[in-house]
């Protein structure tokens, strides 16, 4: 009996820990150990989800549209750039250092500059998402290319395969696990970057709604938005995992 109980606790230790934190959090709020503007209780946040569900749904859909569009474009650009950088050594030497420099600049610092150059429409948001999502994918795929078996590359060359045949039949399959590793990071970056870009202006989106809630002192709604963004990012990463299992079938074997 005790052994079965320990086994169950080990399997569900993350859930138990999460429920424990929520319980302590709720009790601390009930006893008013923390002011509401610092940390609303889980129950208040849940009530905000129910109360503001229509607004949350509307602004979530607006954020999702921008994030998914930017992510798709970012993935396409990253894949094309990776192939070119792998084929042309001089292009890799030219672009890679600049990409590293761009990644060291905080997103919140780049966003106002893009707004200044491109206006308050959707374009600066898309560009910002592309800037943040391409780098993890490019680095991951290039790493996958570098881990290709040299003996297999030699074999393809002896069979007189051209560079595109080597890429399609060998390099791409080998680098797919690396691609998905980078895609997981880019998915989370896409949603976070979208919310950050919405802070700077606009009429819809979770970032805009968060700023509006802050001005109205609706701190429970602010926390609800934060949790919602996190859940959307986790859902996106889970979808990537599911896609990977179906695309890379040999990995399961």
Predicted feature descriptions by range:
Residues 144-182, 206, 210:
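Short cytoplasmic-facing helical segments at TM-TM junctions of multi-pass membrane proteins
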Residues 69-99, 116:
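Transmembrane-helix boundary motif in ABC transporter permease subunits
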Residues 127, 131, 164-196, 229, ...:
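Transmembrane alpha-helices
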Residues 3, 31-75:
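Periplasmic/extracellular loop-to-transmembrane helix junction in inner-membrane transport proteins
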Residues 100-136, 143-144:
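Generic hydrophobic transmembrane alpha-helix motif, especially the helices
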Residues 116, 192-229, 248-253:
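Glycine-rich helix-loop "coupling/hinge" segments at transmembrane-helix boundaries
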């Amino acid at each position: 009996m005790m052994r079965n109980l320990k086994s169950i606790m080990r399997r569900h230790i993350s859930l138990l820990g999460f429920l424990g934190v929520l319980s302590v959090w709720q009790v601390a709020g009930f006893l008013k150990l923390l002011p509401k503007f610092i940390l609303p209780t889980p129950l208040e946040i849940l009530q905000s989800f129910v109360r503001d569900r229509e607004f949350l749904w509307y602004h979530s859909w607006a954020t999702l549209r921008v994030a998914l569009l930017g992510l798709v474009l970012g993935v396409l650009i990253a894949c094309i750039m990776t192939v070119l950088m792998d084929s042309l050594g001089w292009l890799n030497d030219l672009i890679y250092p600049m990409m590293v420099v761009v990644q060291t600049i905080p997103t919140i610092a780049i966003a106002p500059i893009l707004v200044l150059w491109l206006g308050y429409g959707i374009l600066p948001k898309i560009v910002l998402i592309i800037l943040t999502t391409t780098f993890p994918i490019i680095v991951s795929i290039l790493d996958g290319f570098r881990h290709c078996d040299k003996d297999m590359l030699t074999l393809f060359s002896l069979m007189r395969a051209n560079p595109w045949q080597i890429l399609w039949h060998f390099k791409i399959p080998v680098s797919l696990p690396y691609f998905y590793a980078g895609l997981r990071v880019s998915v989370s970056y896409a949603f976070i970057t979208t919310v950050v870009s919405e802070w700077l202006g606009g009429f819809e989106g979770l970032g805009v709604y968060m700023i509006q809630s802050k001005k109205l002192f609706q701190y429970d709604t602010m926390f609800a938005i934060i949790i919602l963004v996190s859940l959307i990012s986790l859902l996106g990463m889970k979808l990537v995992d599911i896609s990977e299992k179906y695309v890379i079938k040999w990995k399961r074997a």
